[in-house]
């Protein structure tokens, strides 16, 4: 459960991400495909080469969904309900992959934000990403 301090840190973090979220989403996906190549199986129709417009577009969607969830910290489940349905019923993505993408997004933030990505912010974002992954996986049960 996110505390009031976590929510404050997440708002501060997303202010730092604003303006770069599309780039960060793209980098997180690219990093995931390199680090965890098995995740490519969910994107057979995508050009997965670096700089691919399809990956860039999907990264933009990932970052937008995270931004939407940051704005809805008191009801992440409702904010991501449609995405949860899509991933569970249509795309049938293994929920373990949400954690892989979360790790990659964390690395991208650490690389780009450096010292501005404090340990406290990292911990709050980790809790947030765990909540997002749980919401995206809740329809699988």
Curated annotation (Swiss-Prot):
Pfam families: Globin
Keyword entries, A-Z: Heme, Iron, Metal-binding, Oxygen transport, Transport
Domain Globin: start-end pairs: 1-141
GO cellular component: blood microparticle; haptoglobin-hemoglobin complex; hemoglobin complex
Keyword Metal-binding: yes
Example GO molecular function: haptoglobin binding
Gene3D superfamilies in the record: Globins
PROSITE patterns recorded: GLOBIN
Tissue: Red blood cells.
Binding site residues for heme b: 58, 87
InterPro entries in the cross-refs: Globin (IPR000971), Globin-like_sf (IPR009050), Globin/Proto (IPR012292), Hemoglobin_a-typ (IPR002338), Hemoglobin_oxygen_transport (IPR050056), Hemoglobin_zeta (IPR002340)
Statement: the UniProt record of this protein carries the keyword Translocase: no
UniProt feature coiled coil, ranges: none
Family statement: Belongs to the globin family.
Subunit record text: Heterotetramer of two alpha-D chains and two beta chains.
Stated role: Involved in oxygen transport from the lung to the various peripheral tissues.
Descriptive protein name: Hemoglobin subunit alpha-D
Species: Anser anser anser (Western greylag goose)
């Amino acid at each position: 459960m996110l505390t009031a301090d976590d929510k404050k840190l997440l708002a501060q973090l997303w202010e730092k991400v604003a303006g770069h979220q599309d780039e960060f989403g793209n980098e997180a996906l690219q990093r995931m495909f390199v680090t965890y190549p098995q995740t490519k199986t969910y994107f057979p129709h995508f050009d997965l080469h670096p700089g691919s417009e399809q990956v860039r577009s999907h990264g933009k969607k990932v970052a937008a969904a995270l931004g939407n969830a940051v704005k809805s910290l008191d009801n992440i489940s409702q904010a991501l309900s449609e995405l949860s349905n899509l991933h569970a019923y249509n795309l049938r993505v293994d929920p373990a992959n949400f954690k892989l993408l979360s790790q990659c997004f964390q690395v991208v933030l650490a690389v780009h934000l450096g010292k501005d990505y404090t340990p406290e912010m990292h911990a709050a974002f980790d809790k947030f990403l765990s909540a997002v992954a749980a919401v995206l996986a809740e329809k699988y049960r």
